[in-house]
A protein has these predicted regions:
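Central regulatory/effector-binding core of bacterial HTH transcription factors
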Residues: 1-32, 108-109
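Alpha-to-beta junction loops
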Residues: 16-24, 44, 119-125
Length: 197
């Protein structure tokens, strides 16, 4: 078994060329040539340096472990966005458009981890998938905020080519992924609040 990490554009081409059997991606990125098996839903979060003045404007959200910060307040800020090859970029652009955010500067990064690290260093603000947030830790504090999971949350799926019959190992891998995802997404929504991280 080979596990490969990459951007959406590369992984989609590799699946189409039969270089990959399965891909994990957002439901919104599934094409008509793919079948998809749902794994779970993750929030799409704002990330700010721990000492950023906008942190004072956050408000608690009932039922969420993340406070809400109005993205409109990001106007004038340096904002880290993913490259256009990353599926997250479409969500980031939708948020900026929906909230009429006028960034002071836009800095493009090749992955969320780098963007989050630059935010931790106080060089700007950005966005991050909740699944990344759960696994990334920095010596400098950052704050995470929900925006609106019903509009920007991402259904995560495992997909495969529609014209491929699943082999026994592929079915077994999908079942293992579903089991792991159930446990993982349960932890995302039941672990302690990062409000005071």
């Amino acid at each position: 078994m080979v596990i490969r990490e990459g951007n959406l554009a590369d992984l989609t081409i590799m699946l189409k060329n039969r270089e990959l059997d399965l891909v994990v991606l957002s439901q919104s990125d599934v094409t008509s040539e793919m079948e998809a098996v749902p794994l779970g839903m993750e929030d799409f979060l704002l990330i700010l340096p721990g000492d950023h003045p906008l942190n004072e404007k956050a408000v608690p959200v009932e039922g969420s472990k993340f406070d809400f910060l109005d993205p409109h307040l990001l106007s004038g800020e340096t904002i880290f966005l993913n490259t256009e090859m990353q599926s997250a970029r479409r969500v980031e652009e939708k948020i900026l458009k929906d909230y009429k955010v006028k960034p002071g500067r836009i800095r493009v990064v090749r992955n969320m981890e780098l963007g989050a690290q630059l935010v931790a260093e106080g060089l700007g603000v950005g966005f991050i998938r909740q699944g990344y947030q759960k696994n990334i830790h920095y010596p400098k504090p950052v704050k995470y905020y929900t925006i609106d999971i019903s509009r920007y949350g991402q259904d995560v799926v495992v997909a495969y080519r529609r014209d491929v019959e699943l082999t026994k190992p592929m079915r077994a891998m999908i079942m293992q992924m579903k089991d792991a995802a159930e446990e993982y997404f349960c932890l995302l929504y039941t672990s302690p609040s990062p409000r005071d991280a």
